[in-house]
């Protein structure tokens, strides 16, 4: 099987991460050993937003559109099993293979519809060898920033998502991986102070940290509710929160609203430059871009996407998507869900 490829520019960061908690998980107690008969999926079903949004051939769309089939979260994880995840609209759902229902800017309500569409379709029966990958939360937070009731919105969204996931497990799903929001306070979008919100405000809608609690954040509420829904030792659902990994390469944030960015080339702290710059010309559209749509204005070049983090004001480059997916694969291996 193909080993996940880690870009060398992140090697020192990843070595450090290996000594820290690798994921914010539902408890892994009772999980299978990664060395004894690990789970090998024969079908991968993806739901969610741009992290899992692909074309009919399986190439990522909400990123720099390189035409590669492993440049999304779902695509990279599926490649571990030798599977290519393709858009289900142009590839009819079958008993084996890879299929994505994800759309570019999906919120939880859209993911609920995606799951409904899957469960009510021909071949929508869940099988033991199915791996289900859900990525959602970024667009939920973007909407909450513009809302007058963000706390209620986060509460309702996470409840509805857990209910939809329970429909999958009630139908027989035994391997469901959920990737929640990244820390949206560290995106170029957040730097524009949307709706006059500070970086601290936006972070507290995304995640919770010891220094800046976000007890009504999307990720914290989702973790709490999934833990309540799945109390048994051997759980069919794991929440793989990549906030720690993302925070390590997307900058250092503190409560006074100052953002410092880690420069990839030297891993040194710099101002809001370097990898923080989105590489797509139409970056405010938050829709990724084709190679012909890359910004080559200095300091950017036609190959900057190979070392930068952001494709646009929210979506990540293939490099960053692969990094997060590789960390998810590593964690999945520890409890026997990946070879």
Give the label of every model feature segment.
Residues 1-5:
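Short, Lys/Arg-enriched N-terminal segments with co-localized hydrophobic residues
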Residues 7-18:
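Bacterial N-terminal signal peptides that target proteins for export
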Residues 29-339:
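Conserved active-site regions of diverse hydrolases
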């Amino acid at each position: 099987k193909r080993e996940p490829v880690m870009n060398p520019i992140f090697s020192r960061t990843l070595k450090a991460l290996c000594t820290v908690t690798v994921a914010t998980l539902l408890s892994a107690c009772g999980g299978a050993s990664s060395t004894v008969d690990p789970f090998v999926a024969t079908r991968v079903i993806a739901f969610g937003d741009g992290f899992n949004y692909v074309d009919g051939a399986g190439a990522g769309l909400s990123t720099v559109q390189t035409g590669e089939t492993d440049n999304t979260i779902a695509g990279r994880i599926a490649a571990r099993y030798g599977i290519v995840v393709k858009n289900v609209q142009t590839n009819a759902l079958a008993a084996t293979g890879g299929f994505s229902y994800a759309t570019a800017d999906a919120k939880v309500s859209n993911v609920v519809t995606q799951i409904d569409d899957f469960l009510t379709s021909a071949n929508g029966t869940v099988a033991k060898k199915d791996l289900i990958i859900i990525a959602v939360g970024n667009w939920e937070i973007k909407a909450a920033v513009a809302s007058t009731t963000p706390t209620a919105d986060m509460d309702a969204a996470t409840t509805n998502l857990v209910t939809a996931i329970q429909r999958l497990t009630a139908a027989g799903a035994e391997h469901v991986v959920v990737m929640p929001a990244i820390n949206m306070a560290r995106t170029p979008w957040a730097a524009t102070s949307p709706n006059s919100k500070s970086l601290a405000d936006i972070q507290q809608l995304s995640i919770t940290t010891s220094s800046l609690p976000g007890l009504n954040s999307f990720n914290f509420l989702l973790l709490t509710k999934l833990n309540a829904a799945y109390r048994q030792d051997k759980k069919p659902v794991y929440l793989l929160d990549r906030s720690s990994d993302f925070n390590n390469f997307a900058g250092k944030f503190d409560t006074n609203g100052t953002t410092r960015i880690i420069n990839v080339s030297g891993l040194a702290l710099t101002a809001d430059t370097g990898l923080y710059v989105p590489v797509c010309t139409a970056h405010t559209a938050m829709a990724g871009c084709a190679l012909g749509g890359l910004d080559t204005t200095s300091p950017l070049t036609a190959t900057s996407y190979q070392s930068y983090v952001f494709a646009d004001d929210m979506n990540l480059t293939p490099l960053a998507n692969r990094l997060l997916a590789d960390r998810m694969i590593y964690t999945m291996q520890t409890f026997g869900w990946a070879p």
